[in-house]
């Protein structure tokens, strides 16, 4: 997605971008390039490492012993992971913008611990 497309979607009422498996912005940078940064400053952008954590979380869940292996249990675990991540971002930044920047800063701090 390029800046002009983001601007067009914003003018049509876009409020949220939930990134999928790959960063959707036409940036050379993997994390928060100029296009992603522009969108993050204009609308709520949920970064791919939160929005698309499902399969990684399912694998982690299934590696546990003595757990229920049902659609409901797996969905509940993934939903809880996403909800907790967004709640953590909201504690640091209760704004509707700069969600990706805040989430990335939190993730980097955790990795550096």
What kind of feature is each model-predicted range?
Residues 2-6, 26-27:
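Cysteine protease catalytic core and zymogen-processing segment of caspase-like enzymes
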Residues 1-4, 11, 19:
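Rossmann-like NAD(P)-binding element
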Residues 13-113:
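Adenosine-phosphate binding glycine-rich loop
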